[in-house]
Amino acid sequence: MTFTILPAVDVVNGQAVRLDQGEAGTEKSYGTPLESALKWQEQGAKWLHFVDLDAAFNRGSNHEMMAEIVGKLDVDVELTGGIRDDESLERALATGARRVNIGTAALEKPEWIASAIQRYGEKIAVDIAVRLEDGEWRTRGNGWVSDGGDLWEVLERLDSQGCARFVVTDVSKDGTLSGPNVELLREVAAATDAPIVASGGISVLEDVLELAKYQDEGIDSVIIGKALYEHKFTLEEALAAVEKLG
């Protein structure tokens, strides 16, 4: 199975943006989300990672636009941001997204996420954003600003609840072009049988190939944002490179 690359489209107030370490107010705009999505589709993407940052930060929603864009695409979409209850989950799935990522609610509502996983199976992935604090990996919620508990305890709980996939982000790496935290990603992959989507820090093509080496350990995909928007390498180059790995 070929390693999957998901170009990221982060949306704020109807614009495609990138943030530095996920912090509100650090947005850099890259045009419209539809333009970005169609560009990545044209360049060969099979999946796209869409983030509604306004919903994630509890300051509005880009839902209608997201649904419209998903409807115009021929590729699979993973959708995340502000999905915290049945209503927002069903609305996200109604866009036609193949997969929905849940972050804060997976940390704060253990019974609800267990029920969502049971009902929707592989359509649900859990977004685990972490930051190293006093030597311990702590999960982050509410747009990455609140503490959500010890990483390994959260992972064990969600694993036992049957979570089909985890998206793992080292917050300190996100949007920094400083390289992924390969060691952390491998440790998380070793602690669960569910596949891992790596996120945060990709800066050069070698970073993608480094992660792809650990496909047999459970890291089967990577989300790439700023590196593509800042032209550090092209999506075509990345897809061709992982294709060669087989």
Swiss-Prot record:
A Pfam family: His_biosynth
EC identifiers of the protein: 5.3.1.16
Keyword Lipid biosynthesis recorded: no
Location of the protein in the cell: Cytoplasm
SUPFAM superfamilies: Ribulose-phoshate binding barrel (SSF51366)
InterPro entries named among the record's database cross-references: Aldolase_TIM (IPR013785), His_biosynth (IPR006062), HisA/PriA_Actinobacteria (IPR010188), Isoase_HisA-like (IPR044524), Isoase_HisA-like_bact (IPR023016), RibuloseP-bd_barrel (IPR011060)
Domain of life: Bacteria
Record key words, sorted: Amino-acid biosynthesis, Cytoplasm, Histidine biosynthesis, Isomerase
Catalysed conversion reaction: 1-(5-phospho-beta-D-ribosyl)-5-[(5-phospho-beta-D-ribosylamino)methylideneamino]imidazole-4-carboxamide = 5-[(5-phospho-1-deoxy-D-ribulos-1-ylimino)methylamino]-1-(5-phospho-beta-D-ribosyl)imidazole-4-carboxamide
Active site: 10
Keyword Amino-acid biosynthesis assigned: yes
Pathway membership: Amino-acid biosynthesis; L-histidine biosynthesis; L-histidine from 5-phospho-alpha-D-ribose 1-diphosphate: step 4/9
GO biological process, one term: L-histidine biosynthetic process
Gene Ontology annotations for the cellular component aspect, listed alphabetically: cytoplasm
Protein family (similarity comment): Belongs to the HisA/HisF family.
Family annotation (PANTHER family): 1-(5-PHOSPHORIBOSYL)-5-[(5-PHOSPHORIBOSYLAMINO)METHYLIDENEAMINO] IMIDAZOLE-4-CARBOXAMIDE ISOMERASE
Name recorded for this polypeptide: 1-(5-phosphoribosyl)-5-[(5-phosphoribosylamino)methylideneamino] imidazole-4-carboxamide isomerase
Species name: Corynebacterium glutamicum (strain ATCC 13032 / DSM 20300 / JCM 1318 / BCRC 11384 / CCUG 27702 / LMG 3730 / NBRC 12168 / NCIMB 10025 / NRRL B-2784 / 534)
Gene behind the chain: hisA
